[in-house]
Amino acid sequence: MLHRSHEPTSNTPYDMVCVIHLRAAKTFSFNTAFLKTAHLFQSVVQQVAVQLQYICFMRYIQVTIKDIARELGISPSTVSRALKDHPDISPETKKAVNALAEKLNYQPNIVALSLRQSKTNTIGVIIPEIVHFFFSTVISGIEDVAYSAGYNVILAQSNESLQREKTDIKALFNSRVDGMLMSISRETTNFDHIEAILSKGVPIVFFDRVHNSPQSSKVIVDDFEGAKEATLHLIEQGCKRIAHLEGPPNLVISKQRLEGYKTALNQHKMPIHPELIVSCPSGTIEEGKEATEKLMALKNPPDGIFSTNDPAAMGAMQAIKEKGLKIPKDIAVAGFSNWFFSSLMDPPLTTVDQPGFEMGQEAARLLIRHIEMKDKDNAELTSETKILKTRLIVRASSLKKK
């Protein structure tokens, strides 16, 4: 029988395993050979544990060039040149260095590299909502250009919150991004947080929802012309009282679309009725539905609706159907943005198409050009504004005349 004095008291994993085996021996009568076997087992477990600890340490602790050099018995400069495939380093040394680097999961220290080069080859992107179909197409365009040019992309979303936007822009700045692409939230009316970053020399290119700063470039669509064309189409279809579901009043895109709507009415000498302009600050389906219910409750309801976006237009169509009215016979509807569901609605929604992918590409090209100009000595940055054309897609929701 084994005595308690023979049991290890340590709480390490390998000692605990041995305790289990040693205690098991108390239940049975084993000879001295078992005791020797148990202690041998403990020794093996100790060795395995040490190896596991080393592997875990090397896996989760940042491996450096010095670690590789120490293991191979060569200088850190030789390791550095081998990793860069320098011609002065022998193929055998390169092979050994790269094999060990892969085994130890070596990754270059991006922070140290960026401090030496004053560049991270990283672009920060801030959007209001990633679930927004238009913004998802913009992101695709940004990544298409950025990755081709050797830049990584860090994406942040404000969720339409000014406070989140402030947090995001600060986090991207602290991450030492080379520049930022940004579309402001609907809550953003004060731009001090943006001006603070611009004053530090970080290039920012705005897209879609923009801040009119002389220090920054922007890529937008012609919201005015797109809205005017959609409203003119409703007029051509015979609409006499056209309502407008207005977007967030602080956003330039909302103002431009409202002006396009008004200009189309003025061109046809049609009066602008304030009661036919209803605010939808969030631009949601629910807001569009509620706004349309109010419009249909008017003594003289509209026979056409131009919505600031497609979700609100979808809500308008729901309200019209629930009222027992026909689209477009009783009320014609047109939206803006050409969301993916627009063509699937019943009837399919007439809408203004925004080239989101192209906008993302142009914004990324502009920013990369600014970054590279900034890297050149005495290069003076000049702000640019790129305006992309919209396209009216006519579908059944607005075709009163067939």
Q: At which residue positions do the language-model features occur?
A:
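N-terminal helix-turn-helix DNA-binding module of bacterial transcription factors
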Residues: 20-23, 28-119
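N-terminal helix-turn-helix/winged-helix DNA-binding helices
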Residues: 58-64, 102-140, 148-151, 159-160, ...
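Short beta-strand-centered segments that line the small-molecule binding cleft or hinge
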Residues: 166-182, 188-225
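Short beta-strand segments enriched in small/hydrophobic residues
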Residues: 71, 76-81, 116-131, 233, ...
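Short, well-structured alpha-helical segments in soluble
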Residues: 163-176, 287-301
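Flexible loop/turn connectors
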Residues: 49, 293-402
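Hinge/beta->alpha junction and helix N-cap segments in small-molecule ligand-binding domains
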Residues: 128-137, 155-164, 184-186, 209, ...
